[in-house]
Amino acid sequence: MEGTITLTPIMTDILTVTMNPALDVSTSTDRVMDTHKLRCTAANLHPGGGGINVARVVHRLGGDCLAMFPVGGVTGQLLQQLLMEEQVPHHCIHIVGETRESFSVRESSTGRDFRFVLPGPDMVQPEWEACLAYVGALPTPPRYLVVSGSLPPGVPTDFCARLAEVAQAASKGSTRVVVDTSGAALVAALDAGVYLVKPSLRELRDLTGRTLTSETEWREAAQQLIHEGQAQVVALSLGEDGALLVTADQALRAKGVAVKVASSIGAGDSFVGGMIWALSQSDDLEQAFRYGMASGAA
């Protein structure tokens, strides 16, 4: 079956798009060793993928959010069921390929996480075009469009840029586009221009071609993206060292929050979810930054 689209009169403050969703499977074992048969704990299943994780956080915070994503096969059905159990509003574009799985194994003796990420299904042009069409045909454009996660095989690297252009055209420029992706997809999205981008330090180094060894250089590199019209806000993720929020006229630094780490998986998505939820309530960027940091540490 080719990608399908079912339009419903949905109004939402925040629309998330996840082109490569996943059924996240997590477990733990005492020690990870090659060639050995490892006895693991019972698996935990969660709906996954960048935008889906963002939507789950927004929903838990009481925000108005809709998650849109392509879905296929038995794995896709299970992912949908898990979202329904959480009562997260969502819309699926049905595709022929099987939704991927991602695996996380925690080594309980050391606290290390081992993550295994599959590429995702091959999507054909009518399927990914249906995703563009859904966003462009919404009766009321969202205030925020969050495009997060990787792109599966078959989807062009400029998809995020195309999606941003569709959203801007439909909303006459009022929708704020937020992008959290990497590689060529990130470059193309920034060339189109977005409201907010959340790169990691490694991604910012790749974007600027600089080593960026100090906070001053981090800030200057982020401001370079802003001055070139690629983004209005840069939320630089620094991992356990916190984050840096940069606009044309201010820079805010937050140190990492000291918490007992149960799992680092999804922390970046939680940061985005908390921040965009706060921005949907108020345009106070400093307050939104605080919410993002708190959500990422939770």
Q: Which residues make up each language-model segment?
A:
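Conserved phosphate/ATP/ADP-binding segment of small-molecule kinases
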Residues: 157-251
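Conserved phosphate-binding/catalytic region of the ribokinase-like
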Residues: 187, 215-298
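Short beta-strands and strand-loop turn motifs
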Residues: 115-117, 142-150, 180, 198-203
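Conserved N-terminal subdomain of the carbohydrate kinase-like
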Residues: 36, 60-144
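Short beta-strand scaffold segments in enzyme catalytic cores
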Residues: 56, 103-105, 242-245
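Short, conserved phosphate/pyrophosphate- and ester-handling motifs at nucleotide-, phospho-/glycolipid
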Residues: 58, 200, 268
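Hydrophobic anchor at the start of a short beta-strand
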Residues: 14, 64-66, 90, 177, ...
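Glycine-rich phosphate/adenosyl-contacting loop at the front of the ribokinase-like
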Residues: 2-68, 77-78, 255
